[in-house]
Amino acid sequence: MKRTAQDILNFVEDNDVKFVKLTFCDIFGNQKNVSLFASELPRAFEQGISFDGSSIAGFMNIEESDLILWPDPDTATVLPWRPAEGRVMRMYCDITLPDGKPFEGNCRGYLQSVVKRARAMGLTVNVGCECEFYLFETDENGNPTHIPLDHGGYFDIPPLDKGENLRRDICLSIEEMGLQPEHSHHESGPGQNEVCFRYAPALKSADNLNTFKSAVKAIAARNGLYASFMPKPLHDQSGNGLHVNMSLVRDGKNLFEGDLTPDSEAGYFVAGILAHARELTAFCNPVPNSYARLGANEAPLYVSWSRQNRSQLVRLPSASGDLCRVELRGPDAAGNPYLVIGLILAAGLDGIANKLPLPEPVNRNLFHPSAAVGLESLPHSLREAITVAAQSDFIAAELPLALQNKYFEYQTQLCHGYENAPDPAVWERTHGFLVI
């Protein structure tokens, strides 16, 4: 049962909550927040909290800058790494204009609209995200270095794996915050880790991903480390992916359970994701560094699907019951989770609505170049991805024009900065490593 504003006010009063962080994302996925003294929370629920949208990248012009934050009480959680006395609560927010009309830059609202579209088709959507990250040492001033925490590899154990205790702290913390951790392990790269948490309804899954990323960053910092979700922080090592898993439920039945056939709703859904994969890339892989990851160290590059084959962009993992799903392996964690999940879902729903044809599965190892002959590839650069997305009828129908323009304008600035940097590595540290 969803929690109400009164439920949260009662909790605040009974549990010594002193501060409330109202959190949201800009259109590029960067988390922002304002902290309220707990006594201001009733006003926040009743009237919203005004803020200057012109100071948030991609939001508003200065001539009409006021926007209103509306906290979602069902997202309330206490930050477990803060003091037990004078506790700190966090809630995610939706954003409107002062007159109550929807704000086009409210990407959380966009995902809600796509979920509503799925519900109108009789579908419940569950989403699970697998998110990789690196742990780096910091210098004597607390600044991040490019020295990984350890030199362990995939599934290694201590002493090669030095991140085990920190992963345990992350799991315990996110569990307190309402996520359900399932397993964690050392990944392929030195200092690279993965913590997996259980799937959830689409909107909650996007909220959970933001919670996870902020928890990892905070817990790493408390341990004198720096956590990076940058797609390719070490150019000669594995990149950080964000594997997005989706399942569809109709009348209590998981549509991905059993054999996938081209004329099934699950088949049409996969066909829609494949049909729009190139158009989604500017959102799923939104920074120049994203393209150093694609096609290297087990990250996919070609638009294809298969059962279980990890070299494919889309695969159907071996599973049973409610765990049957489709997995999109191309995205990284640099993007806006509400746009990423919303657009992937919208692409799949478009496949169902238009009964798009499902290509034949590709049962080859696409990490061997000769095996990919004849297959369409994802864009090879952010500039190419912007061009594909900007010319897409699908994207034009899904996202407000103002949001598209600001999004692509910002990405074009990133391309220009990267391409003209005297030292691209220094530029990537400032605009990627230190912010993602």
Language-model features: locations:
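Glycine-rich, acidic/polar active-site loops that bind/position phosphate-bearing ligands
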Residues: 1-436
